[in-house]
């Protein structure tokens, strides 16, 4: 059988622990037998990041700017325990954070929907994609404990020394204050990423803030989205038969719970942090969530939404059998292959991505799955497979 050819490589970012083991299995059993796989390989495993002083992460992000499509394995973001375990030179930053900053991207997370894994919300039939703004607000906030009576103010000092002051509160006793910010350029970039991705996936886009209460801060988000939509995207949305819809965040939550899904929900940083966990949990499993970083310049980085599955990795090292769900990691590869095919006009590659996704879903819907799904499925007859067995079962259906 002749293999599918590729003209341009995908940037491949290898990772850590159990997901690194699955990565190799997926390539060996599901990709390399069918594709003459071209990748620009970067080892983002923690040991190699440490050896290169994290330069490898920066290099992989810059390569994504060159080739426009990347696929990333889950990676460890070190804490104090990991610094000790891996004898690290320092506590390296989150690779995702570094890559996101270089590509100036927005993260879109969507559940993989299969029969037999039923959402908690019974009327959800289609995926709900969460787009989270990844800059500023409370995550770059400055906070202060107020010890007792006094006046707290916001002060803006212009380059010429002119001051603008706004009273926050006249304190009669102890309290707390918080200052947070955002920048128009980041909000504009977020808006364009959301509108572009909606066009890309032919889905309606919802955006929600609390502009009735936050008349300057949240209202600026609302205004920037509307201005960019009207000037750059309205006609394109009309042609695609999709719509942009703005509402208040509390109304959006109520509408989401009553909807059947099938749209992108753009959220400010904190709202996106909370709502993406709510949506993924309500759809059944974090191991069934895709994640793609989209930059307004048209760079795409695909990955699973979950971590490195540390507990299973330690079992694997002891020679014990694991039943680790590889679905989201498989879909990271299919997402990247499909986008590569789309950009290069390679229909064969796009068709293969569709075929692999169908084989994965068919395997689960026929009752063959990993332990985590077996515990929540509504299917009457279930066969629990180990990590490798599940991937081989998918290969049989390809």
Where are the regions a protein language model picked out?
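Glycine-rich phosphate/pyrophosphate-binding loop and the adjoining helix
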Residues: 134-135, 140-191, 198, 343-350, ...
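Glycine-rich phosphate/nucleotide-binding loop
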Residues: 256-355, 359-366
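A structured beta-alpha segment of the ubiquitous adenosine-cofactor-binding alpha/beta core
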Residues: 49-62, 229, 233-262
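N-terminal alpha-helical transmembrane segments of multi-pass membrane transport
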Residues: 2-8, 18, 22-23, 28-52, ...
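Flexible, glycine/charged-enriched surface loops at secondary-structure junctions
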Residues: 35-41, 201-209, 233-246, 341-353, ...
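N-terminal glycine-rich phosphate/adenylate-binding segment common to multiple enzyme folds
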Residues: 47-159, 163, 270-274
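Glycine-rich phosphate/diphosphate-binding loop of Rossmann-like nucleotide-binding domains
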Residues: 6-25, 29, 154-247
């Amino acid at each position: 059988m002749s293999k599918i050819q590729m003209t341009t490589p995908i940037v491949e970012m290898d990772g850590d622990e159990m997901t690194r083991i699955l990565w190799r299995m997926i390539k060996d059993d599901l990709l390399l037998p069918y594709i003459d796989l071209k990748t620009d390989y970067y080892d983002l495993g923690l040991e190699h990041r440490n050896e290169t002083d994290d330069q490898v992460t920066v290099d992989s992000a810059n390569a994504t700017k060159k080739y426009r499509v990347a696929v990333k394995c889950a990676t460890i973001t070190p804490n104090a325990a990991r610094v000790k375990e891996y004898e690290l030179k320092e506590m390296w930053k989150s690779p995702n954070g570094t890559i996101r900053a270089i590509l100036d991207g927005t993260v879109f997370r969507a559940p993989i929907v299969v029969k037999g894994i039923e959402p908690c919300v019974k009327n959800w039939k289609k995926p709900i994609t969460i787009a989270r703004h990844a800059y500023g607000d409370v995550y770059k906030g400055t906070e202060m404990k107020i010890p007792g009576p006094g006046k707290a103010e916001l002060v803006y000092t212009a380059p010429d020394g002119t001051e603008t002051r706004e009273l926050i509160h006249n304190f009669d006793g102890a309290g707390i204050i918080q200052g947070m910010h955002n920048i128009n350029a980041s909000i504009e970039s977020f808006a364009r990423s959301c509108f572009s991705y909606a066009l890309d996936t032919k889905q309606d886009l919802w955006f929600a803030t609390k502009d009735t209460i936050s008349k300057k801060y949240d209202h600026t988000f609302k205004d920037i989205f509307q201005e960019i939509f009207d000037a750059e995207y309205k006609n394109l949305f009309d042609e695609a038969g999709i719509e942009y819809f703005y509402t208040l965040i509390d109304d959006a939550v109520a509408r989401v719970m009553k909807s059947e899904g099938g749209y992108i929900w753009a959220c400010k940083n904190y709202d996106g942090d909370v709502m993406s966990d709510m949506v993924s949990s309500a759809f059944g499993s974090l191991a069934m969530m895709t994640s793609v970083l989209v930059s307004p310049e048209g760079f795409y980085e695909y990955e699973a939404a979950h971590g490195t599955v540390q507990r299973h990795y330690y079992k694997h090292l002891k020679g014990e059998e694991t039943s680790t769900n590889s679905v989201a990691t498989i879909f990271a590869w299919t997402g990247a292959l499909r986008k590569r095919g789309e950009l290069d006009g390679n229909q064969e590659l796009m068709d293969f991505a569709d075929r692999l996704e169908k084989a994965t879903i068919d395997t689960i819907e026929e009752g063959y799955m990993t332990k985590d799904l077996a515990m929540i499925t509504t299917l009457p007859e279930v066969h629990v497979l180990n990590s490798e067995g599940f991937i081989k079962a998918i290969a049989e259906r390809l």
